[in-house]
Swiss-Prot record:
This is Unconventional myosin-XVI. The keyword Cytoplasm applies. SMART domains: ANK, MYSc. Gene3D superfamilies: 1.10.10.820, 1.20.5.4820, 1.20.58.530, Ankyrin repeat-containing domain (1.25.40.20), Kinesin motor domain (3.40.850.10), Myosin VI head, motor domain, U50 subdomain (1.20.120.720). One of its GO terms (cellular component) is myosin complex. It comes from Homo sapiens. Residues 401-1145 form the Myosin motor domain.
């Protein structure tokens, strides 16, 4: 049965033991079965008879290493004596010294050094024993190696010296630094020395690369230079290799990458560098291990794991090279401490050894009938709360009194002070202030003033004592707490007083109040502190005559507060000078440590029997002081205390089994003291008299009985490697017996303290949380007995030292500073004879403690000279402080020489000491033999106690490091140094080791102070130095405790006894110094920093003054009295600080109030903004969902209509082809019929559009754009030129004139209303359309009318009777007579590309007839015709004699223009002599005029897009109302859904009118839904490509509004103020992403993307809500009334019915690869489009098949026109790519100034007219061509901005698969 080691370690102790026991039973069973099977073999029994008993022999080397590891020094000596080689190497290549340095075996290390082992031996990693000793922090080994001549500058494989591995602040580091400094080696030399090896390799690599070497070259094992540099940690070399193309992921023969090596050898910086350069962390070596699997530290492993995650993300989404490096802000030197080798595993016992020791514990308990009968458990959940009856809290606080502060008394003398204190004590007012000092009188009874309610009452936000509360300990704590964060400096409480004055109880109350500041962890910390105090009282307190709970050690509590949260986070306890001698002997009337009495009274009889404990009198350590038998109540109380102690031990981390083990050790200590010795020979050699007791003690300690007996009675010494054994006398044996007991108890006490520190230790401390500390120092009090010995001397020496420190802080420092600063003092302080007393004890080298230590080093056989030396010291000392008892206090010689007695004049009085036996009591060093035995103990706790090191203060070294002071010197040694910094340094620093041998070791040892022996005196000196050092870092708060009487009686006040205490404490001096002195002394900078709010408030304009002046101004502004200014400091009274703090607090409250108001205002504003945004989001979402639903329905309807339209169009195309000959024959007949029925049709019957006589673009695109959105019609060339002129006169004519001959250059100055004539019966005709025959039926073909022939016109015919008078020169006047009809229909961008019907042949010249055109007057002018009357305008054009064919047609295309906004002044600024002089409402018309579409009137501003011609009669047709299903706002009755809607606010006086055909579906007009605000104009882009809209028409059955919504004026596009003749800009974006196409036949379109400037729609305003502000509005309303309808003459229809002209318009040009490629990609063999998105600028085009216009398939009688398909424009454009027309169109599109391009177009047309060529010949003949206009720059306004979306519906709504 096998089990994983990790799983075994994770199991609880009890479960693991059961599992191991079962496994062991199975192993034994298997073993027996195997043995039985083996015995059955033949001949086994015979061989067994002749065989000897087998013995296992181990190699001496293995046994020697095992003995060194387990500190079995006796075994080591035996093995060395038997011949074991001390020069044996271990498996890592190191020597036995490496093993001794690893396991801190200094004794064996000294033996090995004496035997010649090399102290500088290096293992496989070049580690010396010094490296290991520093890494493990074993100062004894370090000092031993240094004294043995070890080279401290040797480097390991990583280039680190031993100092690099020594943690800063440790003793090992101190030894090395002192040694190097003693020998003249500084850190700069060390840094340069360390850089020699990496710089050498850097030089070699540079030379190798400069000579052309391959940076990735491998050696025989596949190792590259990068591998070597990464393993060695040479960062500069690695950087150089990477700069020259080094492969990051290159592998050697074992598949190790440089990252593997850097991680394995702990090169943290290189790991980071490789990861920054994108090294792959997922690569594995030959062992299938990634770099993170073999990382030398957890930090490197964590960094690699993060890199692995980042690498995986990089594979999904590539990251930049610097991304990984920026994920974690690693510092340049990430770890101060270099990563240790793996051979330095944690110092813990293997799990097998732990289980073995535990089993032996259990076996021992079973053998001795131990205490525990239940199964062991790892931890037993205990109630953390202390047991006790819950009583209601009582609060009884006295009101504040005038005498709360003694410094305010009017009369200051000893009597008055004593009287006030006595009066307050009688009123249970035990606390009194002396300034900031608290005076406490022990009441010897419980007072209800320490409850949690009282603690909360004293909570303060500023630390100032509430005026309604009396003085209290809690108020002093509050002041210190707030001062901690105000000063950012640790605080400390110093409690002083005699034994029994209440210091320990006061410290507990301080801790209790501070735990209330622990936040959420208050209950936990408070409970832990209670349990910790319980343990300390049991193991460190004793009962004396002065105090029933007297502290026998010095404790220093350190409470840690989080600086950010200002809460208590953890604590730590420091213990000093445990009174160990009390264990062995107690003074008269005093007891031993309380724990033994708790065991004797608290354990049951059975438990005591298991521990062999009897009554108190049976044990020597407990029966020295005769005591009366404890009462039953006392025993019961001890039993309860023991139960509480067990629970406390459980809380701090001890299991029940471990608690029982502690009790076993304590019982062993008691039994150890009972061992007696006897002499059996004349040599007085000691032997143990009771071997059974010895065996019992050895069993409890789990050591060998013989070894324990030998260690107690003999001593082993080594001289030059030889072991010398010396027998002890009885006296010496008893001394070592007691010394072993004291050492065991003191180490156990330190072990408990360390365990409690682990419990109180803050878990957040390791996270580098900034903490501030509050310390509480509780020292044992001053004492005096009838016989005062060495113990009382140590206690009183400590009190003397602390009293001197208090006086220094309170008096001497102030006195010195006042003298230095030139400030006068009213009081003076004299230290008295304290300095003489302290010098007598602590002076070196002639002080009492030094003398005692010297005598303690003498061997036992030498007679002591201590009395003589002591008398000599007394004679030389200050007689006022110390004098010999040979003389009395008056200097008289005494009769008897006491020898070791002397008298000390302490601050508290005169005390005589007798130091007999002080030398033995001072010794505290166990013999090596006893250490050998205790280190081999199988008791886990005992083994740990004696293998752990002791600090210089005598305490056990803590198990966990002090993170607060942790650091490393390698941060100084590893600083980056460039190559230039060491160039030229030829000094060989490797020879620095010679400097280390120049001086001896005496000075070195003196500086280390390591020469001091391990004595009580040395521990006392070190402890006091440590305590004073802690206090000096803090701001002190003094609490003086006073005993009211010497009998421990409550309510008893001994005036004489209290007066004596007040005098030696110096209460009167304290009162005077606080009243007249300056206890608050701050430097100028500290003052301004502490009271910064006041300084900022009072020194607004005076901050440039000196610091002293600023401090003075602040104090003057605060109106304080009694302060003084020194040279560098401010001297304040103690109440000044409180007043200044109050002023700061008031300012802070005002600031907080202001901030609260502002934050509330901002919060409300933010809330309102969020609510508004939320409402807008909800509205937008609802609107979006509704629009999406509406558009989806519209799309469905459009697809249905498209299907029907495609079918009709196809049938109409076939019918047209079949009826073409018939139409040619009946041309004249139709003309005659049309001429005859002209008047009749005008008066009655519906009006018709004839498919053969009009441009299909006008109706098809108009209807199709209701689905597309933006305008597809733009003003013609003439209207563009005429928009800038608005000066004209109304026509007085109301009847048509005679029909004169007309000039071909005559232009119709048609008004906007005439061009955009409306249908008054649009709503009635919508319902009639469903009942009439479809276009493809027979009825439709019979009703077609033949248009009349084109009349002959005179070029000199002028237009008369127009709405406005035409002024200025006409461009047609300069044109030759031989170019009639040369003017072509010019389409601005977005205009449908239609192939116009050919003009009449020249043979019709004689048959010319006049053409009547119907016009309306200006409805808004008073002199205009009436709205119900028509104005007939006469136009007549005669062809010249030499004229060619009539007006042909050519194509222009571009972007559809939006409205041009112009100021009125710009409008009037047009020059009169411009090329275009027709006023804006009347465009310069083209020779071809399709029938006009008349819409319901709306006040529009766009100009007509129809190609008006002087030869084209007008025919008024009512268009059907389209159902768009866009759910736009419904227009009122009388308004057309097909007409543009513009608000009055959007149209200015100078705005150019647009075509009604454009406005019908203009995206910038009212018909389009709201769009996003336009982006800024983009840079010029490529010219927009033409598109071909869908070949279908939508005719819904019901009319529906077109306008979807109106944007506000803020959503308008930027207004453009063009110059005269400026070209229009690009139109707005389309409202739909795609044009729906027929499910039967796909759209014949070549949709291209084109740029345009987004033009948002203007706000919608229905006509009914807008006043008539212009003649156009009035005329539109006239049209809406239906009173006037224009009629197109039959002649006009005949003009456009040209015969004999048919062109295949579907042939695309091969010269334009882009067009052909796009066409081939987007069209199938039937020329069908597939999902190409419409351009937003080329928003209309007309389709045709084979050059023929395709009708819409609707009958004429229904009022619908036969409209052409929108594919004609594209196919025509593709055919004539190389023609002059195409070139002109391209130049127009690329023109930066379109007006210039239009002027060039007119010139080109004029040139064509002059040549007199037939337009058809121009189209069909390639030679010689007229050169096109010169190229112009690309217009910047024609490009669509990036990101401007023309789509309102997503592409998903258009199913391209239909």
């Amino acid at each position: 049965m096998e089990i994983d080691q990790c799983l075994l370690e994770s199991l609880p102790l009890g479960q693991r033991q059961r599992l191991v026991k079962r496994m062991r039973c199975e192993q034994i069973k298997a073993y027996y079965e195997r043995e039985k099977a083996f015995q059955k073999q033949e001949g086994f029994l015979k061989r067994l008879k002749h065989a000897k008993n087998p013995k296992v022999h181990f190699n001496l080397t293995d046994m020697l290493q095992d003995a060194i590891i387990h500190h079995n020094d006796k075994e080591v000596l035996r093995l060395l004596k038997e011949g074991a080689d001390p020069h044996t190497l271990v498996s890592s290549g190191g020597s036995l010294l490496h093993l001794c340095a690893r396991y801190d075996n200094a004794f064996i290390a000294e033996i090995l050094i004496d035997r010649g082992v090399n102290v500088n031996h290096q293992d496989e990693d070049f580690w010396t024993p010094m490296h290991i000793a520093c890494a493990c922090d074993n100062p004894d080994i370090v000092l031993l190696l240094v004294l043995a001549g070890a080279n401290v500058l040797l480097q390991d494989v990583n280039g680190n010296i031993p100092l690099d591995y020594a943690v800063e602040g440790t003793e090992s580091s101190s030894i090395l630094l002192t040694y190097l400094d003693e020998n003249g080696v500084d850190l700069t030399s060390l840094r340069q020395m360390k850089l020699q090896r990496p710089m050498s390799m850097l030089t070699d690599v540079k030379h190798f690369l400069s000579s052309g070497g391959n940076v990735n070259e491998k050696n025989d094992e596949g190792v590259t230079l990068l591998h070597m540099a990464c393993a060695s940690g040479y960062k500069e070399v690695v950087s150089l290799i990477l700069e020259h193309g080094g492969d990051l992921n290159i592998v050697d023969d074992q598949y190790w990458t440089p990252l593997h090596l850097a991680a394995k050898y702990g090169q943290t910086n290189l790991v980071k560098l490789l990861l920054m350069h994108q090294a792959n962390p997922h690569l594995v070596n030959c062992n299938e291990e990634k770099a993170s699997d073999i990382a030398a530290s957890e930090f490197i492993e964590e960094m690699l794991l993060k890199a692995e995650i980042a690498w995986e993300e990089k594979m999904k989404e590539p990251l930049s090279a610097s991304t990984l490096a920026q994920e974690e802000p690693y510092e340049e030197i990430i770890h101060d401490l270099p990563v240790l080798s793996s051979k330095l595993s944690p110092l813990v016992l293997p799990i097998a050894k732990q289980d073995s020791l535990l089993e032996k514990d259990i076996m021992f308990k079973d053998a001795t009938k131990g205490l525990c009968k239940q199964q062991s458990q790892d931890s037993i959940p205990e109630n953390p709360m202390m047991s006790g009856s819950t009583k209601p809290e009582q609060v009884k606080l006295m009101p504040p009194a005038p005498n709360d502060d003694l410094a305010t008394l009017s009369e200051l003398n000893d009597g008055s002070l004593l009287y006030e204190i006595q009066k307050r004590f009688g009123n249970n007012q035990i606390y009194t202030f002396i300034g900031d000092i608290l005076l406490l009188v022990n009441p010897y009874k419980e007072l209800p003033i320490y409850s949690s309610m009282v603690s909360q009452l004293y909570f303060s936000s500023s630390g100032k004592l509430c005026s309604s509360l009396p003085p209290h300990l809690f108020s002093c704590v509050e002041r210190a707490f707030h001062q901690l964060f105000r000063e950012q400096r640790p605080q400390c409480f110093i409690l002083s007083g005699e034994r029994g004055s209440g210091k320990s109880e006061a410290s507990k109350q301080i801790i209790r109040h501070l735990t209330c500041r622990a936040g959420a962890s208050r209950a936990t910390l408070d409970s832990r502190f209670k349990h910790v105090v319980c343990i300390l009282e049991a193991f460190g307190h004793a009962k004396t005559t002065l105090n029933d709970l007297s502290s026998c050690f010095i404790k220093y509590f350190e409470l840690q507060f989080c600086e950010r949260k200002q809460q208590l986070t953890g604590a730590r306890i420091y213990t000093y000078l445990l009174e160990k001698s009390r264990l062995v002997s107690q003074p008269l009337g005093q007891s031993n440590f309380l724990i033994f009495y708790l065991l004797m009274d608290g354990l049951s009889a059975e438990e005591k029997y298991g521990l062999h404990l009897n009554n108190l009198c049976a044990h020597r350590y407990l029966n020295q002081t005769i005591q009366d038998d404890a009462s039953t109540g006392e025993r019961s109380l001890n039993r309860e205390k023991l139960a509480v102690l067990k629970r406390a031990l459980n809380v701090v981390g001890f299991s029940s089994l471990e608690v029982e083990n502690l009790f076993v050790i304590l019982a062993a200590i008691l039994h150890l003291g009972d061992i007696r010795f006897t002499a059996l020979n004349e040599g007085n050699s000691a032997f143990v008299s009771d071997l059974q007791l010895l065996e019992q003690v050895a069993g409890m300690l789990q050591v060998s009985t013989d070894e324990l007996a030998s260690a107690l009675t003999t001593d082993i010494q080594y001289f030059k490697g030889d072991m010398i054994i010396r027998r002890h006398t009885i006296q010496i044996a008893e001394f070592f017996r007691d010394l072993l007991a004291k050492s065991l108890y003191s180490r156990l006490f330190s072990f408990l303290v360390n365990t409690m520190n682990s419990c109180l230790h803050s878990q957040d401390e390791q996270k580098s949380m900034q903490t501030l500390d509050i310390g509480i120092l509780d020292i044992f009090g001053f004492e005096e007995f009838q016989k005062n010995e060495f113990e009382q001397l140590c206690v009183n020496m400590t009190n003397e030292k602390m009293h001197h420190y208090i006086n220094e802080v309170l008096f001497l420092h102030e006195q010195v500073e006042c003298v230095q600063e030139g400030v006068t003092m009213e009081t003076a302080y004299s230290p008295g004879n304290q300095n003489g007393v302290l010098d007598f004890f602590f002076q070196k080298p002639s002080g009492f403690l030094t003398l005692l230590d010297e005598e303690s080093q003498m061997i036992w056989s030498v007679e002591s000279n201590f009395p003589k030396k002591l008398q000599s010291l007394l004679e030389s000392s200050n007689t006022n402080a110390v004098y010999s008892p040979m003389k009395d206090g008056n200097g008289n010689v005494a009769l008897k020489d006491h020898g070791t007695a002397f008298t000390i004049m302490h601050y508290a009085g005169r005390v005589m000491y007798d130091v007999v036996g002080a030398i033995e009591k001072n010794k505290d060093s166990l013999s090596q033999n006893l250490l050998f035995v205790m280190k081999t103990s199988e008791n886990v706790v005992i083994n740990h106690l004696f293998q752990s090191k002791l600090s210089q203060t005598g305490s056990l070294v803590s198990a966990y490091p002090s993170f607060k002071f942790r650091g490393h010197k390698s941060a100084l040694l590893s600083k980056k140094m460039t190559a230039s910094s060491i160039i030229g340094e030829n000094k060989n620093y490797l020879e620095l080791s010679k400097l280390l041998k120049k001086k001896g070791t005496s000075t070195f040892l003196q500086r280390l102070e390591r020469g001091d022996p391990v004595t009580i005196a040395s521990q006392l000196r070190k402890s006091l130095m440590d305590i004073i050092g802690k206090l000096q870092k803090c701001t002190p708060h003094f609490i003086h405790c006073i005993r009211p009487n010497n009998s421990k009686l409550p309510d008893t006040f001994d005036n004489f006894y209290v007066s004596a205490q007040l005098q030696y404490i110096g209460v009167l001096e304290m009162v005077k110094i606080f009243r007249y002195g300056y206890p608050v002394r701050l430097s100028f900078s500290d003052f301004l920093s502490r009271y910064k709010p006041l300084a900022d408030t009072f020194l607004r304009e005076k901050k440039e003054q000196s610091a002293a002046e600023r401090c003075r101004l602040v104090l003057q502004q605060c109106k304080l009295q009694g302060w003084q200014m020194g040279v560098r400091k401010v001297f304040l009274k103690y109440w000044h600080a409180d007043q200044l703090n109050d002023l700061c607090l008031q300012l802070q409250r005002k600031i907080i109030t202001c901030q609260k108001v502002i934050r509330g205002f901002l919060a409300r504003q933010h809330l309102l903004q969020r609510i508004s945004i939320r409402q807008q989001e909800v509205t937008s979402i609802n609107s979006f969902l509704q629009n999406t639903e509406d558009m989806g329905l519209k799309t469905y309807d459009a697809l249905v209509i498209q299907n029907a339209s495609d079918i009709a169009r196809e049938n109409d195309r076939l019918r047209s082809e079949m009826n073409a000959p018939y139409h040619k024959e009946k041309l004249e007949v139709r003309n005659m019929q049309e001429e005859g029925s002209k008047r009749t049709d005008d008066k009655s019957g519906p009006r018709h559009f004839h498919p053969s006589s009009m441009s299909v673009c006008a109706a098809v695109d108009g209807l199709g754009q209701c689905l597309v959105g933006p305008s597809i019609w733009s003003p013609s060339l003439h209207s563009v030129f005429s928009m800038d002129d608005s000066s004209s006169l109304p026509s007085p004519r109301k009847q048509p004139p005679p029909k004169p001959k007309r000039d071909p250059n005559t232009r119709l100055s048609a008004s906007y209303e005439a061009v955009s004539a409306c249908l008054s019966a649009a709503r009635e005709a919508a319902n009639e359309a469903l009942a009439r025959p479809r276009p493809h039926s027979d009825d439709y073909s019979t009703m077609k009318k033949i248009p009349p022939r084109k009349p002959k016109r005179s070029p000199n015919t002028k237009l008369s009777g127009s709405y406005e008078e035409i002024s200025g020169s006409r461009p047609g006047d300069a044109r030759p007579a031989g170019a009639p009809g040369a003017a072509a229909r010019v389409l601005t961008p977005g205009t449908p590309q239609c192939a116009l019907p050919p003009a009449a042949p020249p043979g019709d010249e004689d048959d010319s007839e006049p053409v009547y055109i119907e016009m309306l007057g200006h409805a808004a002018r008073p002199d205009s015709p009436d709205p119900g009357e028509s104005v007939y305008e006469e136009m007549k054009c005669c062809l010249p004699d030499d004229g060619g064919p009539g007006a042909g047609s050519f194509l222009l295309h571009g972007a559809s223009p939006p409205l041009l906004h112009r100021a009125p002044e710009d409008e009037a600024a047009g020059p009169p002599g411009d090329a275009c002089d027709i006023p804006p409402p009347f465009p310069n018309l083209l020779p071809h005029r399709p029938p006009l579409l008349v819409f319901p009137p709306t006040p529009v501003t766009c100009s007509p897009a129809s190609d008006e011609s002087p030869l084209t009669p007008l025919e008024v047709k009512k268009l059907p109302v389209l159902e768009t299903n866009l759910k736009y706002p419904v227009q009122p009755e009388g308004s057309s859904p097909l007409s543009p809607q513009y608000s009055k606010s959007q149209k200015g006086d100078g705005d150019r009118p647009a075509s009604p055909g454009l406005a019908l579906f203009n995206g910038s007009g009212r018909a389009s839904p709201p769009s996003t605000p336009p982006p800024p104009p983009p840079p010029p882009g490529p010219p927009p490509a033409p598109y071909r809209p869908c070949a279908h028409l939508a005719f819904p059955p019901e009319p529906a509004p077109v306008n979807a919504g109106k944007a506000g004026p803020s959503a308008e596009a930027p207004k453009v103020h063009p110059k005269p003749n400026s070209a229009p800009v690009a139109g707005p974006c389309s409202s739909f992403p795609k044009i729906p196409y027929s499910p039967v036949k796909a759209t014949r379109a070549d949709a291209r993307k084109a740029g345009s400037s987004a033009s948002p729609p203007a706000p919608y305003s229905p006509p009914s809500s807008r006043p008539l502000s212009s003649p156009l509005d009035e005329l539109a309303s006239l049209f809406n009334s239906g009173r006037s309808v224009l009629r197109k003459s039959a002649a006009g229809r005949k003009i456009r019915e040209a015969e004999g002209f048919e062109t295949n318009m579907n042939i695309s040009s091969r010269d334009d690869p882009s067009t052909s490629e796009i066409t081939s990609e987007t069209q199938d063999r039937n020329a069908n489009n597939h999902g190409i998105q419409l351009s937003n600028s080329l928003s209309s085009a007309i389709t045709a098949e084979n050059g023929n216009s395709i009708s819409n398939g609707l009958p004429e009688e229904d009022g619908y026109s036969r409209l052409s398909i929108s594919g004609t424009g594209t196919s025509t454009f593709q055919r004539h790519r190389d023609s002059h027309t195409t070139q002109v169109i391209h130049q127009l599109r690329l023109s930066e100034n379109e007006s210039v391009a239009l002027q060039e177009l007119l010139d080109w047309r004029r040139k064509l007219c002059e040549e007199g060529q037939d337009w058809q010949q121009i189209l069909h003949h390639a030679e010689p061509r007229v050169p096109p206009p010169p190229p112009c720059k690309k217009p910047s306004l024609l490009k669509k901005p990036e990101g401007a979306s023309c789509n309102r519906l997503p592409s998903e709504l258009w199913d391209t698969t239909i």
